Amino acid sequence: MRIALIDGEHYPDVNRWALEKLNVECAVFIGGMEKIGSIEDVERALNVKLYHDKDPFKALEKALEENDVEEVIDLSDEPVMTPELRFRIASYLLKRGIAYKGADFEFRPKEWIKLEVPSINIIGTGKRVGKTAIGGFVGRTLKERYRIVIVTMGRGGPEKPEIIRGDKITITPEFLVKIAEQGRHAASDHFEDALTAGVPTIGCRRCGGGLAGFTFLDVVKEGIEVAKTLKPELIVLEGSGASFANVLSDGFITVVSALQGERIKTYMYPLRISLADIVVVTMVEEVSEGEKIKRIIKEINPDADVHLTRFAPRLIGNVEGKAIVLTTSQESAKKMAKELERKGIEIAGYSGNLANRGRLREEMNRFNYDTVIVELKAGAVDVAIREALSNGKKVVFLDNEPVNVDGKNLKSAIKKLAERILHDKGG
């Protein structure tokens, strides 16, 4: 059935006229009192059940609990129904698989997939928020107790799901160059997770991403079927950019960058946050700044376990001689270079241009180095690693390890989430 959202900026008889035209059986009062005497006047005029509360979301929640709702029609308008409120309502409804339609807009949810195998869905609020680093960290943490498979999706992912046995093979620079020479994206997330987590990974392709984070096309469902053949105790799904797999998992981890600030309460970022059991705020330089973002997150999702973190360099391999550091942003390259210097590594230079292949080549040619320390991102393989190996240089991979700055323990929280999921699933 359909229900409608109405307000007190419309006269009650106008609301009744619209509800009759649209054959709507009940309504939720959003607010506004200019053209009504009282809420009781509206109830008497409508001839349908009216849900109302000081908090319109509580009224909407009750309406959804008591009715089998497939679509919500928005008959409200400014100033009661602001664009920000509409996006909050859209986020609220799409999370529940309910369509939301207004005069000139329509949001329809992608069908949620439910799995028999226990699963955790890792989603991000944008690109470069550290989602893959968190995915690798989750894999490393949980493989201590469970058989884990990570299913990734990406804009450079394979057309058919591809298995990388990170638990059985060593991901070397030479191996990745051979992959790139075959015309494949060797810096895709399933290669990175196999490298950093040491677990089996399944790479999938996706194209397009909507406001809510659903993809236009992907092969994740097929990837999950491939993952099942490995008999995992737990499947970890990892999103791509601001998009994520439409799997209604048993647990959600949402990754937010501190650099996003108040933006996370706009548009449909609240949907991603409202799904979360754990929210990881990355790139927190000042705890006070992180606390501001934490308050925003708690307003959206009071039950979320929020962790304020920064990234510390974790090297996969041993550095020899002078090293250069290559990442996807100048700021992160500078920070990582400084931290590595404090650990006694001689840094000859750094670059944040992994995503700009032309500039990356120019900068590498200017440096005098023995070892390349590189994130497995963007042009890492087809430019940085290929260039280093052709010149007889050593390659060491750089992973970003989340470190709590708030006194909490993210690793412990992830273990507890997995324990709860396996317990609830009877595992």
UniProtKB/Swiss-Prot annotation:
Catalyses which reaction(s): (2R)-2,3-bisphosphoglycerate + ATP + H(+) = cyclic (2R)-2,3-bisphosphoglycerate + ADP + phosphate
Protein name in the entry: Cyclic 2,3-diphosphoglycerate synthetase
Superkingdom: Archaea
Top EC class of this enzyme: ligase
Gene Ontology biological process terms, A to Z: gluconeogenesis
Family matches, as InterPro entries: Cyc_diphosphoglycerate_synth, P-loop_NTPase
Location within or outside the cell: Cytoplasm
UniProt record similarity statement: Belongs to the cyclic 2,3-diphosphoglycerate synthetase family.
Its biological purpose: Catalyzes the formation of cyclic 2,3-diphosphoglycerate (cDPG) by formation of an intramolecular phosphoanhydride bond at the expense of ATP.
Keyword list, A-Z: ATP-binding, Cytoplasm, Ligase, Nucleotide-binding
EC number, as in UniProt: 6.5.1.9
Main location: cytoplasm
GO MF term list: ATP binding; cyclic 2,3-diphosphoglycerate synthetase activity; ligase activity
Cellular compartments per GO CC: cytoplasm
